[in-house]
Amino acid sequence: MLTATMHGPIVSLDALAGGGTHEGNNTSATRARSSLHESVRCGAAGKVDKALEHGLEAYREEDAPVELRLEAAKLCIDWYAALGSYGQCRKLAAQAARLGERYLERCHPLILMMRNSEAYWLAILGQHDMAIRKFSALLADMKHCPGLDPEISIAIRNNSAMPWKHTGKWKKAARVYRELLSEMEGQREEADMTLLTVRDNLAEVLSADRCYD
Protein backbone atom coordinates (compact mmCIF):
# COMPACT_ATOMS: atom_id res chain seq x y z
CA MET A 1 0.00 0.00 0.00
CA LEU A 2 1.30 3.47 -0.88
CA THR A 3 0.78 6.84 0.72
CA ALA A 4 1.51 10.31 -0.60
CA THR A 5 1.30 13.40 1.57
CA MET A 6 2.34 17.04 1.39
CA HIS A 7 5.55 16.15 3.22
CA GLY A 8 7.40 13.96 0.79
CA PRO A 9 7.44 11.18 -1.77
CA ILE A 10 5.22 8.14 -1.84
CA VAL A 11 6.16 5.52 0.76
CA SER A 12 5.17 1.86 0.87
CA LEU A 13 3.47 1.13 4.17
CA ASP A 14 4.01 -2.59 3.66
CA ALA A 15 7.75 -2.00 3.45
CA LEU A 16 7.65 -0.62 7.00
CA ALA A 17 6.34 -3.81 8.53
CA GLY A 18 9.21 -4.26 10.93
CA GLY A 19 12.49 -2.87 9.67
CA GLY A 20 14.41 0.19 10.68
CA THR A 21 16.38 1.40 13.65
CA HIS A 22 13.53 0.92 16.10
CA GLU A 23 11.95 -2.32 14.96
CA GLY A 24 9.20 -2.63 17.55
CA ASN A 25 7.22 -5.88 17.81
CA ASN A 26 5.15 -7.65 15.20
CA THR A 27 1.81 -7.28 17.00
CA SER A 28 2.17 -3.52 17.39
CA ALA A 29 3.40 -3.18 13.81
CA THR A 30 0.39 -5.12 12.55
CA ARG A 31 -2.01 -2.95 14.54
CA ALA A 32 -0.33 0.24 13.35
CA ARG A 33 -0.37 -0.83 9.71
CA SER A 34 -4.02 -1.84 9.99
CA SER A 35 -4.88 1.57 11.44
CA LEU A 36 -2.92 3.29 8.68
CA HIS A 37 -4.74 1.32 5.99
CA GLU A 38 -8.04 2.35 7.56
CA SER A 39 -6.88 5.96 7.76
CA VAL A 40 -6.06 6.05 4.06
CA ARG A 41 -9.32 4.28 3.17
CA CYS A 42 -11.44 6.70 5.22
CA GLY A 43 -9.58 9.69 3.83
CA ALA A 44 -10.19 8.52 0.27
CA ALA A 45 -13.90 8.24 1.12
CA GLY A 46 -13.97 11.78 2.46
CA LYS A 47 -14.36 10.69 6.07
CA VAL A 48 -11.61 12.92 7.38
CA ASP A 49 -12.58 12.71 11.06
CA LYS A 50 -12.40 8.91 10.96
CA ALA A 51 -9.20 9.05 8.93
CA LEU A 52 -7.63 11.21 11.62
CA GLU A 53 -8.87 8.89 14.36
CA HIS A 54 -7.28 5.84 12.73
CA GLY A 55 -4.10 7.73 11.90
CA LEU A 56 -3.66 8.80 15.52
CA GLU A 57 -4.18 5.20 16.61
CA ALA A 58 -1.21 4.21 14.45
CA TYR A 59 0.92 7.12 15.63
CA ARG A 60 0.26 6.30 19.30
CA GLU A 61 1.17 2.62 18.90
CA GLU A 62 4.29 2.98 21.04
CA ASP A 63 5.82 -0.43 20.29
CA ALA A 64 5.43 -0.13 16.52
CA PRO A 65 8.46 0.73 14.33
CA VAL A 66 9.20 4.43 14.64
CA GLU A 67 9.23 4.81 10.85
CA LEU A 68 5.65 3.56 10.73
CA ARG A 69 4.63 5.99 13.46
CA LEU A 70 6.21 8.89 11.58
CA GLU A 71 4.36 7.91 8.41
CA ALA A 72 1.19 7.98 10.51
CA ALA A 73 2.12 11.46 11.74
CA LYS A 74 2.47 12.64 8.13
CA LEU A 75 -1.03 11.44 7.34
CA CYS A 76 -2.51 12.91 10.52
CA ILE A 77 -1.01 16.30 9.73
CA ASP A 78 -2.73 16.20 6.35
CA TRP A 79 -6.04 15.30 8.01
CA TYR A 80 -5.64 18.10 10.58
CA ALA A 81 -4.92 20.48 7.69
CA ALA A 82 -8.06 19.34 5.87
CA LEU A 83 -10.01 20.15 9.04
CA GLY A 84 -8.38 23.57 9.35
CA SER A 85 -6.58 22.66 12.59
CA TYR A 86 -3.27 24.27 11.64
CA GLY A 87 -2.07 24.60 15.22
CA GLN A 88 -2.43 20.84 15.63
CA CYS A 89 -0.45 20.36 12.41
CA ARG A 90 2.49 22.28 13.85
CA LYS A 91 2.23 20.60 17.24
CA LEU A 92 2.19 17.07 15.83
CA ALA A 93 5.04 17.80 13.41
CA ALA A 94 7.22 19.04 16.28
CA GLN A 95 6.34 16.02 18.43
CA ALA A 96 7.01 13.59 15.59
CA ALA A 97 10.38 15.18 14.82
CA ARG A 98 11.45 14.76 18.45
CA LEU A 99 10.18 11.18 18.45
CA GLY A 100 12.19 10.35 15.35
CA GLU A 101 15.37 11.89 16.73
CA ARG A 102 15.22 9.50 19.69
CA TYR A 103 15.65 6.48 17.42
CA LEU A 104 16.87 7.55 13.97
CA GLU A 105 19.79 9.45 12.49
CA ARG A 106 19.23 13.21 12.39
CA CYS A 107 19.45 13.10 8.58
CA HIS A 108 16.78 10.42 8.21
CA PRO A 109 14.32 11.60 5.52
CA LEU A 110 11.31 11.20 7.80
CA ILE A 111 12.85 13.47 10.44
CA LEU A 112 13.74 16.06 7.81
CA MET A 113 10.17 15.94 6.51
CA MET A 114 8.74 16.41 10.00
CA ARG A 115 11.05 19.35 10.67
CA ASN A 116 10.06 20.82 7.32
CA SER A 117 6.41 20.39 8.25
CA GLU A 118 6.88 22.11 11.61
CA ALA A 119 8.58 25.12 9.98
CA TYR A 120 5.96 25.22 7.22
CA TRP A 121 3.09 25.39 9.70
CA LEU A 122 4.88 27.99 11.79
CA ALA A 123 4.96 30.15 8.65
CA ILE A 124 1.29 29.46 7.94
CA LEU A 125 0.44 30.44 11.52
CA GLY A 126 2.30 33.73 11.16
CA GLN A 127 5.22 32.83 13.45
CA HIS A 128 7.68 33.96 10.82
CA ASP A 129 10.77 34.59 12.95
CA MET A 130 10.54 31.10 14.42
CA ALA A 131 9.90 29.62 10.97
CA ILE A 132 13.00 31.36 9.59
CA ARG A 133 15.13 29.94 12.41
CA LYS A 134 13.71 26.45 11.94
CA PHE A 135 14.28 26.51 8.18
CA SER A 136 17.79 27.91 8.62
CA ALA A 137 18.76 25.06 10.95
CA LEU A 138 17.12 22.51 8.66
CA LEU A 139 18.90 23.78 5.56
CA ALA A 140 22.22 23.69 7.41
CA ASP A 141 21.64 20.08 8.48
CA MET A 142 20.66 19.09 4.94
CA LYS A 143 24.20 19.88 3.80
CA HIS A 144 25.35 16.91 5.86
CA CYS A 145 22.81 14.51 4.34
CA PRO A 146 24.44 12.92 1.27
CA GLY A 147 22.08 10.94 -0.92
CA LEU A 148 18.97 12.78 0.22
CA ASP A 149 16.05 12.32 -2.18
CA PRO A 150 16.05 15.40 -4.46
CA GLU A 151 12.27 15.71 -4.07
CA ILE A 152 12.62 16.13 -0.31
CA SER A 153 15.43 18.65 -0.75
CA ILE A 154 13.42 20.68 -3.25
CA ALA A 155 10.32 20.64 -1.05
CA ILE A 156 12.27 21.92 1.94
CA ARG A 157 14.10 24.62 -0.01
CA ASN A 158 10.92 25.75 -1.74
CA ASN A 159 9.09 25.98 1.59
CA SER A 160 11.99 27.86 3.17
CA ALA A 161 11.02 30.92 1.11
CA MET A 162 7.57 31.09 2.71
CA PRO A 163 8.42 33.26 5.72
CA TRP A 164 10.35 35.66 3.48
CA LYS A 165 7.38 35.88 1.14
CA HIS A 166 4.87 36.32 3.96
CA THR A 167 6.88 39.18 5.48
CA GLY A 168 7.40 41.02 2.19
CA LYS A 169 11.09 40.09 1.83
CA TRP A 170 10.52 39.53 -1.87
CA LYS A 171 14.17 39.54 -2.96
CA LYS A 172 15.14 36.91 -0.41
CA ALA A 173 12.25 34.71 -1.49
CA ALA A 174 13.12 35.24 -5.16
CA ARG A 175 16.71 34.17 -4.50
CA VAL A 176 15.50 30.82 -3.16
CA TYR A 177 13.27 30.20 -6.17
CA ARG A 178 15.92 31.29 -8.69
CA GLU A 179 18.48 28.91 -7.20
CA LEU A 180 16.01 26.06 -7.44
CA LEU A 181 15.11 26.89 -11.03
CA SER A 182 18.76 27.10 -12.05
CA GLU A 183 19.17 23.49 -10.92
CA MET A 184 15.86 22.18 -12.23
CA GLU A 185 15.55 23.75 -15.68
CA GLY A 186 17.01 21.51 -18.33
CA GLN A 187 16.81 18.55 -15.97
CA ARG A 188 13.03 18.18 -15.93
CA GLU A 189 10.20 18.09 -18.42
CA GLU A 190 8.51 21.43 -19.03
CA ALA A 191 5.25 19.96 -17.73
CA ASP A 192 6.84 18.81 -14.45
CA MET A 193 4.55 20.02 -11.66
CA THR A 194 7.36 20.81 -9.23
CA LEU A 195 9.13 22.92 -11.84
CA LEU A 196 5.89 24.74 -12.67
CA THR A 197 5.19 25.37 -8.98
CA VAL A 198 8.60 26.93 -8.39
CA ARG A 199 8.19 29.09 -11.51
CA ASP A 200 4.80 30.25 -10.28
CA ASN A 201 6.26 31.06 -6.88
CA LEU A 202 9.03 33.13 -8.47
CA ALA A 203 6.55 34.96 -10.69
CA GLU A 204 4.42 35.73 -7.63
CA VAL A 205 7.23 37.33 -5.64
CA LEU A 206 8.60 39.22 -8.66
CA SER A 207 5.14 40.62 -9.29
CA ALA A 208 4.79 41.61 -5.65
CA ASP A 209 8.18 43.33 -5.84
CA ARG A 210 7.20 44.91 -9.18
CA CYS A 211 10.23 43.35 -10.77
CA TYR A 212 9.75 41.29 -13.92
CA ASP A 213 12.14 38.88 -15.63
Task: Kindly label every feature range from the protein language model.
Residues 16-34:
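TPR-adjacent "capping" and linker segments in tetratricopeptide-repeat scaffold/adaptor proteins
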Residues 26-29, 63-70, 104-112, 146-154, ...:
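Helix N-cap/loop-to-helix boundary motif
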Residues 30-60, 81-86:
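Alpha-helical segment of the N-proximal tetratricopeptide repeat
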Residues 36-44, 70-82, 109-124, 151-166, ...:
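Conserved alpha-helical positions within TPR/SEL1-like repeat arrays
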Residues 56-60, 97-102, 137-144, 179-186:
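Amphipathic alpha-helical segments of tetratricopeptide repeats
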